[in-house]
Amino acid sequence: MFNLSNLLASLVGIAMAISIHEFGHAYSAHLLGDDTAKYNGRMTLNPAKHIDPLGLIILFICHFGWAKPVPVNPNNFKNYKVGNLIVSISGVIGNLIGAIICALILKYFDMYAIQKIFGQAMWINIGFGAFNLLPIPPLDGWGVISSLLPYKFNDFIYKYENVGYAVLLISIFTGIYS
């Protein structure tokens, strides 16, 4: 059954989770020497800079969506693999921090609207973070795994990376994550 308060709380939670996640990537890349995201106006918590309109529409239809990827040039890092690892995991860490902040707000504020919005935001942050840990391209878990593998696997990784997109789409549309 349609519930407007749930929809609005979800929209706020999704905007918050996407913004925190993408800002985490942009800020960590900046700290590691890559200002690509900063020059593209993406080092911000403003959801309008991160939300992909089509990804948001698909999210409400299929319960799966996407944000605009933060542009990162790992060639600007002192160590390509370490930098890529840190930037990949930073979005997930951002979602974890977001969930903790929401939990603290829930603990200290006992108003219905705050409980509704920040309760949704907490669970959405946890869900985004957990989902992004899957080791499937283009998710962050894949960035972590590929950064930990020796350089000799790079050709294999890049050759078969597109297979990961297909696996991700098939698994989502078959309902394996439901």
What are these regions (language model features)?
Residues 1-178:
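Hydrophobic transmembrane alpha-helices and their immediate loop junctions
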